[in-house]
Amino acid sequence: MIFQRTVQKMVQTTGVGLHSGNKVTLRIMPAPVNSGIVLTRTDLSPAVSIPAKAELVRETTMCTALVNDAGIRISTIEHLFAALAGLGIDNAVIEVDAPEIPIMDGSASPFVFLLQSAGIKEQAAAKKYIKINKTIRVEDGDKWAELKPFKGFRVNFKIDFNHPEIARSQQHMVMDFSTSAFVKDISRARTFGFMRDIEYLRANNLALGGSMENAVVLDEYRVLNPDGLRYEDEFVKHKILDAFGDLYVAGHAIVGEFCAFKTGHALNNQLVRALLVQQDAWELVSFDKEADVPVSFMVPGTQAFA
């Protein structure tokens, strides 16, 4: 049987909030089987917990945010969730003492390191996967995203930015998911933004924690970061990273192919919601033998370094 996973022990880090610019402390702790990912705001009294569910993603401007019925929010979850998805973590409690997850270096790599430092352990319950049986597609103008049947988890993603630096890079990528491919080829890709947008955001008290320490920054012509890019195709890879995190609010790893053109947080979440309500388009499955599993996660106790 392929088992569910959680972390072996509590692990903690600090960083800054992308939008507030304030210090944020994050803790990741083990959780029981079938509990999923639950986020808790410890800065509130009493503390407020919000389960990671697609219907609670109620804000998708600049990030993915969970918001409960009382309006309490936890923002910028997507990079952490990409790491959880990439390492196959089914159950965890995430504590944060702020309304947003720390941005770290703008990628998922610090969260991958954190989770690997905590250790990953198997639990005494079958791991469940969402197997796509029928194609689900959502559109917004010329943007679109779809999930369709595939034996494995494949991503086919294309971006289209009218910017000379991005246009010079590869804007289309197809990858078959595995933990090692995610850690090596995707996890280090940073969020990116344009100077003209950053100036507007800061004037509106947003992106106060944003800097070249946690984002790729472009002017009208080039990348401004002194060290340049981590990957030649870092832009499309970061959009894939975001999608991994956004799709993980479905609650389980997906067996299928994710195809997308110019999609972002909003359309990714619309796709997950459309999938979950069309119950004949998918089924929950588990696997008895490692050889039968179409999605390859690393073996607990091993390391997959970028």
Swiss-Prot record:
Keywords: Hydrolase, Lipid A biosynthesis, Lipid biosynthesis, Lipid metabolism, Metal-binding, Zinc. SUPFAM superfamilies: Ribosomal protein S5 domain 2-like. Its cofactor is Zn(2+). Gene3D superfamilies: lpxc deacetylase, domain 1, lpxc deacetylase, domain 2. The keyword ATP-binding does not apply. It catalyses: a UDP-3-O-[(3R)-3-hydroxyacyl]-N-acetyl-alpha-D-glucosamine + H2O = a UDP-3-O-[(3R)-3-hydroxyacyl]-alpha-D-glucosamine + acetate. The keyword Lipid metabolism applies. InterPro entries: Ribosomal_Su5_D2-typ_SF (IPR020568), UDP-acyl_GlcNac_deAcase (IPR004463), UDP-acyl_GlcNac_deAcase_C (IPR011334), UDP-acyl_N-AcGlcN_deAcase_N (IPR015870). Its EC number is 3.5.1.108. Zn(2+) binds at residues 79, 238, 242. One of its GO terms (cellular component) is membrane. One of its GO terms (molecular function) is metal ion binding. GO terms for biological process: lipid A biosynthetic process. Coiled coil: none annotated. Pathway: Glycolipid biosynthesis; lipid IV(A) biosynthesis; lipid IV(A) from (3R)-3-hydroxytetradecanoyl-[acyl-carrier-protein] and UDP-N-acetyl-alpha-D-glucosamine: step 2/6. The active site is at residue 265. Belongs to the LpxC family. Catalyzes the hydrolysis of UDP-3-O-myristoyl-N-acetylglucosamine to form UDP-3-O-myristoylglucosamine and acetate, the committed step in lipid A biosynthesis. This is UDP-3-O-acyl-N-acetylglucosamine deacetylase.
